[in-house]
Curated annotation (Swiss-Prot):
Catalytic activity, reaction form: N(1)-(5-phospho-beta-D-ribosyl)glycinamide + formate + ATP = N(2)-formyl-N(1)-(5-phospho-beta-D-ribosyl)glycinamide + ADP + phosphate + H(+)
Annotated binding of Mg(2+), by residue: 279, 291
Binding of ATP, residues: 120, 162, 167-172, 202-205, 210
Gene Ontology molecular-function annotations: ATP binding; magnesium ion binding; phosphoribosylglycinamide formyltransferase 2 activity; phosphoribosylglycinamide formyltransferase activity
Pathway: Purine metabolism; IMP biosynthesis via de novo pathway; N(2)-formyl-N(1)-(5-phospho-D-ribosyl)glycinamide from N(1)-(5-phospho-D-ribosyl)glycinamide (formate route): step 1/1
Subunit field text: Homodimer.
Ranges where the ATP-grasp domain occurs: 125-320
A matching Pfam family: PurT_C
GO cellular component, one term: cytosol
Entry-linked InterPro entries: ATP-grasp (IPR011761), ATP-grasp_carboxylate-amine (IPR003135), ATP_grasp_subdomain_1 (IPR013815), PreATP-grasp_dom_sf (IPR016185), PurT (IPR005862), PurT/PurK_preATP-grasp (IPR054350), PurT_C (IPR048740), Rudment_hybrid_motif (IPR011054)
Protein name per its UniProtKB record: Formate-dependent phosphoribosylglycinamide formyltransferase
Residues that bind N(1)-(5-phospho-beta-D-ribosyl)glycinamide: 27-28, 87, 298, 367, 374-375
EC number: 6.3.1.21
Gene (name only): purT
Length: 404
């Protein structure tokens, strides 16, 4: 019998409050804030710019450069949260590791998970070299000349180049011949989160599709940690950024089982409690590990309409030590609403038309500034099957017009 104490939740803004600090207050962080507040948690949201989506709904908000360890330590010591939840990758994770080692704070899922996954080198070496999981062939290089040598030395064409520290497709491109190398190298150097630096070059896998397998480590009623899986999420990307997702994505039983085994291995090693977005390539019954995010995943926004508990509720419950329910309610899809204009304080037209069809919903993120390819919202839909849901979600997002 487990001796783990049952979670006790306090009252916000009182001496009994359970305080959670989110590092990153974008659209995903905003939904986590809402999920936590529904459970009576006092939430502090931190981001690098004012009036971020999560700032608008948190009990308190701070504007901090989260890559500055001194500034980050100061806000953590000021607020004294019980739990720190990294919601983005651009964080001084060395500090989180040190604070967790000191016993000063608990990081969800773990400080080590946040540290390893902020850098493609850390998580790729863990997956491929420590855990022995199947991945694309890869090399890490620091110069354009080393990139050429890696390609000629076995990676071959076509191949994919990415900064070791970037997100949302920034700095990522496909190299199809030697003529592409110089431009791809420059683009990768411009797209890194911390400026120019190291890149990963990967051999191209001829996959049929890619999925996100949302994997949840949570405590059951007996206090034991159990790993549970959501139904696989299919998605389409343009320039490395997701434009639509759907759930469930059809898979062979063998591929689904192998996907779960890979996800179990990597999340089990990272440890802790919470949701992980495990990205996988699939060809027939073969599965390759790609990446993992120890937090809700952008493609998982479909779960806002498709699941009994969406990915944000799952993360909130898990990090608080509560049981979760990963069941699918109905096939669903999400479709991104882009800004389309460069402006502050935009207005949204066509919302009534977007919501006129039964089984639809939208989320407008409330970002203070729009630009052409910035994700400003998402259209959501459910239907009898994913094809119908995708078509319906696309109609929702297309109906919404952004006006400066």
């Amino acid at each position: 019998m487990s001796t783990f104490p049952a979670p006790v939740l306090g009252t916000p803004l009182s001496p009994t409050a359970t305080r959670v600090m989110l590092l990153g207050a974008g659209e995903l962080g905003k939904e986590v804030v809402i999920a936590l507040q529904r459970l009576g948690v006092e939430v502090i949201a931190v981001d690098r710019y004012a009036d971020a989506p999560g700032h608008q709904v948190a009990h308190r908000a701070h504007v901090v450069s989260m890559t500055d360890p001194q500034a980050l330590r100061q806000v953590i010591e000021q607020e004294r949260p019980h739990v720190v939840v990294p919601e983005i990758e651009a964080i001084a994770t060395d500090l989180l590791v040190a604070l967790e080692d000191e016993g000063a704070v608990h990081v969800t899922p773990t400080a080590r998970a946040a540290h390893l996954t902020m850098n493609r080198e850390g998580i790729r070496r863990l997956a491929a070299e420590t855990l022995g999981l199947p991945t694309s062939p890869y090399r890490f290089v620091d110069t354009e000349q080393a990139l050429r040598e890696a390609i000629d030395g076995g990676i071959g064409y076509p191949c994919v180049i990415k900064p070791v520290m970037s997100s949302s497709g920034k700095g990522q491109s496909i190299i199809r011949s030697a003529d592409d190398i110089a431009a791809a190298w420059r683009y990768a150097q411009e797209g890194g989160r911390v400026g120019a630096g190291r890149v990963i070059v990967e051999g191209f896998i001829e996959f049929d599709y890619e999925i996100t397998l949302l994997t949840v480590r949570a405590r059951g009623a007996d206090g034991q940690i159990v790993t549970q899986f959501c139904e696989p999420i299919g998605h389409r990307q343009v320039d490395g950024d997701y434009v639509e997702s759907w759930q469930p994505h059809p898979m062979s039983p063998v591929a689904l089982q192998r996907s779960r085994e890979i996800a179990l291995a990597v999340t089990g090693d990272l440890g802790g409690l919470g949701i992980f977005g495990v990205e996988l390539f699939v060809a027939g019954d073969q599965v390759w590990f790609s990446e993992v995010s120890p937090r809700p995943h952008d493609t998982g926004m479909v779960t806002l309409i498709s699941q009994v508990q969406n990915e944000f509720e799952l993360h909130a419950r898990a990090l608080l030590g509560l049981p979760v329910d990963t069941r699918l309610r109905q096939p669903g899809a999400s479709s991104v609403i882009y800004g389309g204009v460069d402006a502050r304080g935009v207005a949204f037209e066509g919302v009534a038309q977007a919501l006129a069809e039964p089984g639809t919903d939208i989320r407008l993120f409330g970002k203070p500034e729009s630009y052409a390819k910035r994700r400003m919202g998402v259209g959501l839909a459910v239907a009898d099957d994913v094809d119908q849901a995708r078509a319906k979600a696309a109609r929702v997002s297309q109906a919404v017009r952004v006006r400066a």
